[in-house]
Amino acid sequence: MIRQELSTSYQELSEELDQVVENSEQADERDKETVKVHGPGILPALDSESASSSIRFSKACLKNVFSVLLIFIYLLLMAVAVFLVYQTIMDFREKLKHPVMSVSYKEVDRYDAPGIALYPGQAQLLSCKHYYEVIPPLRSPGQPGDVNCTTQRVNYTDPFSNQTLKSALIVRGPREVQKRELVFLQFRLNQSSEDFSAIDYLLFSSFQEFLQSPDRAGFMQACESAYSSWKFSGGFRTWVKMSLVETKEEDGREAVEFRQETSVVNYIDQRPAAEKSAQLFFVVFEWKDPFIQKVQDIITANPWNTIALLCGAFLALFKAAEFAKLSVKWMIKIRRRYLKKRGQATNHIS
């Protein structure tokens, strides 16, 4: 509708301009005939009247020029609004494709006891105890001690090699993070044909889930497939500080991952020379802090903001078109007034 009204207005303007040209030519012929009939005595009146009409014509032209400039300015604003609409839609689609990672922290009083799966091989478990804050000095290193931890033995097939049978020692991890609970384990390896000695271990989220699982071998196969494994070497005390990361996937599933910081301290072996042939392993497991890190992908594109911006852009386009239509009508009105005054002046002169 706006385009039809604009085309009609411009057609009326062109017709009025043709009429102005014809009227101006007829007025010039009348002026010439009047000059011929009345002679040179009427020239001063004609000069003054033509001067005033030229001033009015120049003012009308100036107004028309300003109107045309305003129309061009609003056309430019319309182009900017169209570009903003296009850019807004493209940004919204880009944000939908690339969500932003959000990280938050949840404080807990205690953790669900994790499971610590150890693969000692030929190494023997000498002692396992739960302590709080401080580990007392070793009394008889290398000798069997108390095993006050909850442990389970599981044999299962390696998920990456069906021909390998693995034996895992599952230990219940610490819970009381506020009291700085820790688990201290000691192993002894009498003889080894390997050039380097180390014990593998992996961490999984819940020891209770392992106990309640009807298929513990399958449970450990799934854990080994999902979690990474680490090592601690003999002749050192390895201190492992654990932290928990919960990641929410795009399909809504939640995955749990352990992150750890390790510090290694050299063990000063003061045993008799006859006992030093057996290598000792020391490892400590403790929670780093009472904060669970939660990671999820969020979409920053807000559809309501996009809709509001699009509505504003379309409103600007509508207002610009309406102003252009009113400007054309105003120019036609000014032209009609000028033609009316020009006709009255011509009649007065004649």
Swiss-Prot record:
Record key words, sorted: Cell membrane, Chloride, Chloride channel, Glycoprotein, Ion channel, Ion transport, Membrane, Phosphoprotein, Transmembrane, Transmembrane helix, Transport
Give the bilayer topology: Multi-pass membrane protein
Residues that span the membrane, as ranges: 65-85, 302-318
Q: Which residues carry this modification: Phosphoserine?
A: S9, S14, S24
The superkingdom of the source organism is Eukaryota
**Phosphotyrosine modification sites?**
Y10
Q: Does the keyword Aminoacyl-tRNA synthetase apply?
A: no
Side Extracellular, residues: 86-301
> Which Gene Ontology cellular-component terms appear in the entry?
chloride channel complex; plasma membrane
Q: Give the GO molecular function terms.
A: pH-gated chloride channel activity
Residues assigned to the Cytoplasmic compartment are 1-64, 319-350
List localization entries: Cell membrane
* GO biological process assignments: chloride transport
Catalyzed chemical reaction(s): chloride(in) = chloride(out)
| Pfam families (alphabetical) | TMEM206 (PF15122)
- Glycosylation sites recorded in the entry for this protein: N155, N162
Family, according to the entry, reads as follows:
Belongs to the proton-activated chloride channel family.
Function statement: Chloride channel gated by pH that facilitates the entry of chloride ions into cells upon exposure to extracellular acidic pH. Involved in acidosis-induced cell death by mediating chloride influx and subsequent cell swelling.
UniProt name for this protein: Proton-activated chloride channel
- Species this protein is from: Bos taurus
The UniProt gene name for this protein comes to: PACC1
